[in-house]
Amino acid sequence: SGGQSAAQAPGSDASGDYGLYMLCPDGSEELLADVSELRVGMVANVLNEYKGVLPEDGQVFYSCIPVTSYRDVAVKSGKYTGWHENFEDAFNSLLLPGVHMVSAPNVLNDHLMDEPLFFQADHHWTPLAAYYLIERMMQTQGVPVVPYDEYDYLVSGFYNIQGLGDPMDLMYPLLPAHGNVMRSGTEGEDAPIIVYNNESYTAYLAGGNHVWTKYTTGFDTGRKALVIGDSFTTAFIPYLMPYYDEVHRADPRYYNSALNGGTVSEPLAQYGIDDVYIILSYDNGIDSDMSSKTLEYLLYG
């Protein structure tokens, strides 16, 4: 499969299998990672369930991020001009109003070949890539976007044991902000937003290895968000802060309802969450139970 013309709009449905396709110079495509159509339907159903527990104007966003090895195939092989997921429209056709699947590969494609969107030193995306995804999500809601360069940065270095590495942008929040680990609605120890002397990806949210964390942003927007996801959320959350009074984070890999006063639906109501963002790596993506059964279990137990 994968004979679709690269001229077709990114996000439109290919005649072949659902998946991530590499774009070839001759206009053909090669399937790199397929996605189960059945799983797309399962995930869509769960996302619609999340919409059902939010306020009437609440929004749900879902996105899965390729890891660095996919970027390496697209960029370093010299064989391709980009990538795209061919099922974004089909996925969104299954979603209720206010629920959105935003294809990270499609958002990032215009920047993929010549901007640092993934670290070489490990498998994560960079803050710039996370920013581009938030930019698209805000545009979807008609919200003005804070430019990437409006933030001040400490430019650090991030190198692995093989000596591969990249500069690393460690942003300073626009307003004084702070985080706290939350346990059953009670504020616990501080949770750093950026650890400026940490030369690894865990500089963002100090790795974020907590069940539930609340970040108070200093902004007065009248809205609060919950970000559910794995380690790819830690570079994402700092750029979400200007749009919410509070940004909460729940990690489905560690979630424990006994520590958090119930399933996710209880703290959603307790904290007055308006919008939910589900950000997962491809490893925990559509074909993974994390994106369907685990997310549903988080909501209902």
Regions found by a protein language model. Give the residues of each.
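Extracellular glycan-modifying ectodomains
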Residues: 1-301
